[in-house]
């Protein structure tokens, strides 16, 4: 939420430099307030746990948030009852005329398949095009981030020589970016993936800002200067409470089967899998969503249909 201060206060300029929202008395008196409308394209096979994680994070805000869920129509879900989807989810044709303050596109377990070979890829392209004019700011996660970077900017993904598995440190490259307000200079997040994007292509794309990265594992968070698109390479920011369980279950499952699996890096104290894992990423996930909703609240036009005109999105 913005803070109302006197227009001549000496701290005002510094606060603006740090990306902290302020308004004067006149703006406060005429400020229009309405619920934020958020659409979630849930690509995960297990829809219900993903819903719970995202709603926990979106609900931890003083802002009123109105959430719709949608799913791909061209892919038949085998892990969620069709009647549940029919009752609680939309398909594209049902929301295509709507406008949203924010859109969230989750990951999907298809990272090792070429984009064009994913059965719902044509539908993904439709969502990406639609988002240009119907959603102010979009969060893309994991495969959703890889897919969007490929569609919008032609950035390729690549197969890693070994699975990235464990808890990894990343450093901020834009400390005062509003999406990262309150983050420490470094933060730790879980990773469990076989692919990565081509970082060199990102560096050579002037429409993109790199917000955080690591020397060991490359880029983690990317954004556009107009805040219309953010890309997060990793699942921590929507599996906040489940990642601890997921990493351990995945490790113990493969170990029990005798499959080649390394102990998740930086996960167990002294790499001892009989001890309780460290849980070091929860606060960053809450902070991340708080900051994103604040950006959306401050910058989206009150009249959502004005999104395309007032905030043209760079291609």
What do the predicted segments below correspond to?
Residues 100, 105-174:
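Cysteine-nucleophile active-site neighborhood
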Residues 1-71, 89-95, 99, 126, ...:
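Amide-donor transfer/coupling interface in amidating biosynthetic enzymes
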Residues 50-53, 79-82, 115-116:
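Short, glycine/acidic-enriched capping/hinge loops at junctions between secondary-structure elements
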Residues 46, 75, 111, 146, ...:
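Surface-exposed, flexible loop/turn segments at secondary-structure boundaries
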Residues 78, 149, 200:
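Active-site-proximal flexible loops/turns
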Residues 73-86:
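N-terminal beta-loop-helix "entrance" segment that forms/cooperates
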């Amino acid at each position: 939420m913005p803070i109302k201060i006197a227009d001549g206060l000496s701290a005002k300029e510094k606060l603006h430099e740090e990306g902290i929202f302020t308004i004067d008395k006149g703006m406060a008196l005429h400020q229009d307030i309405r619920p934020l409308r958020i659409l979630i394209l849930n690509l995960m096979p297990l829809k219900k746990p993903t819903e719970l994680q995202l709603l926990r994070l979106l609900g931890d805000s003083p802002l009123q948030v109105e959430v719709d869920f949608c799913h791909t129509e061209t892919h038949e879900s085998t892990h969620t009852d069709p009647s549940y989807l029919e009752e609680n989810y939309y398909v594209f044709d049902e929301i295509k005329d709507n406008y949203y303050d924010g859109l969230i596109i989750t990951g999907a377990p298809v990272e090792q398949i070429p984009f064009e070979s994913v059965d719902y890829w044509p539908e993904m392209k439709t969502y990406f095009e639609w988002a240009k004019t119907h959603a102010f700011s979009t969060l893309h996660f994991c495969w959703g981030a890889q897919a969007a970077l490929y569609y919008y900017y032609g950035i390729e993904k690549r197969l890693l020589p070994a699975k990235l598995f464990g808890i990894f440190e990343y450093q901020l490259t834009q400390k005062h970016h509003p999406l990262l307000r309150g983050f420490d200079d470094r933060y730790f997040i879980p990773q469990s993936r076989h692919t990565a994007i081509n970082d060199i292509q990102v560096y050579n794309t002037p429409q993109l800002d790199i917000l955080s990265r690591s020397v060991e594992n490359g880029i983690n968070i990317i954004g556009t200067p107009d805040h219309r698109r953010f890309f997060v390479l990793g699942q921590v920011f929507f599996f906040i409470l489940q990642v601890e369980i997921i990493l351990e279950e995945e490790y113990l499952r493969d170990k029990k089967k005798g499959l080649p699996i390394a102990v998740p890096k930086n996960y167990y104290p002294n790499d001892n899998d009989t001890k309780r894992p460290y849980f070091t990423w929860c606060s960053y996930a809450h902070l991340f969503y708080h900051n994103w909703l604040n950006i959306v609240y401050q910058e989206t036009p009150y009249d959502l249909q004005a999104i395309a005109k007032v905030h043209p999105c760079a291609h």
